[in-house]
Amino acid sequence: METLSQDSLLECQICFNYYSPRRRPKLLDCKHTCCSVCLQQMRASQKDLRCPWCRGVTKLPPGYSVSELPDDPDVVAVIAIPHASENTPVFIKLPSNGCYMWPLPVSKERALLPGDIGCRLLPGNQQKPVTVVTMPMEQQPLHGNIPQDIIEEEHERRGVVKSSTWSGVCTVILVACVLVFLLGIVLHNMSCISKRFTVISCG
């Protein structure tokens, strides 16, 4: 039951898409949360933003956009990269298609979501674009402190997921072959029936 509420916290309850940098969780005046894309669509069709659940009105001053509404801090706290210290390791994508880790200070006012584009000043006042990337557990730098049995369990779990995916693909292919075979039988029978009628009408 807890996973259902956790999933519903991570997705917009209007379009059921997960929150992302493009679909930021925006907090309405009534304290309900929707993604910024749904709110922009509502804003395009009506003057004020009306909450689809409680019908409460969130007024935006003229010239203000939906992006200026505050992010829901509870949702951002769940989907943002967890930070134990002030610096969080992120990958910086370089023009040469190489990446390296760099500690990026996390802003207290606006946490970065995975996939967000930020900017980091490098020596010599050069600016480089920074993309926040979530890292799988086994690729994190403190991998040496994790007991070996936990690592093996994680690899086994991933193997089960891969094998279940492969068995799903095989099932789909098998069902498709059976359907094609049955369709061939039906078409063959139809051609035999039409030939019988031709023989009867001619003879």
Swiss-Prot record:
Cytoplasm listed as a keyword: no
Residue intervals of every RING-type zinc finger in the record: 12-55
Compartment annotation: Lysosome membrane
GO CC terms in record: lysosomal membrane; lysosome; organelle membrane
Keywords: Lysosome, Membrane, Metal-binding, Transferase, Transmembrane, Transmembrane helix, Ubl conjugation pathway, Zinc, Zinc-finger
InterPro entries attached to this UniProt entry: RING_RNF152, RNF152_C, Znf_RING, Znf_RING/FYVE/PHD
PROSITE patterns cross-referenced by the UniProt entry: ZF_RING_2 (PS50089)
Keyword Transmembrane helix recorded: yes
EC code(s) of this entry: 2.3.2.27
Class of this enzyme: transferase
Gene Ontology biological process terms in this record: apoptotic process; cellular response to amino acid starvation; negative regulation of TORC1 signaling; positive regulation of autophagy; protein K48-linked ubiquitination; protein K63-linked ubiquitination; protein monoubiquitination
GO molecular function, one term: zinc ion binding
Pathway the protein acts in: Protein modification; protein ubiquitination
Transmembrane segments: 167-187
Catalytic activity as recorded in UniProt: S-ubiquitinyl-[E2 ubiquitin-conjugating enzyme]-L-cysteine + [acceptor protein]-L-lysine = [E2 ubiquitin-conjugating enzyme]-L-cysteine + N(6)-ubiquitinyl-[acceptor protein]-L-lysine
Signal peptide from the UniProt entry: none
Pfam families attached to this UniProt entry: RNF152_C, zf-RING_5
Membrane topology: Single-pass membrane protein
Protein role: E3 ubiquitin-protein ligase that acts as a negative regulator of mTORC1 signaling by mediating ubiquitination of RagA/RRAGA and RHEB. Catalyzes 'Lys-63'-linked polyubiquitination of RagA/RRAGA in response to amino acid starvation, thereby regulating mTORC1 signaling. Also mediates monoubiquitination of RHEB, promoting its association with the TSC-TBC complex and subsequent inhibition. Also mediates 'Lys-48'-linked polyubiquitination of target proteins and their subsequent targeting to the proteasome for degradation.
Family: Belongs to the RNF152 family.
This protein's name: E3 ubiquitin-protein ligase rnf152-B
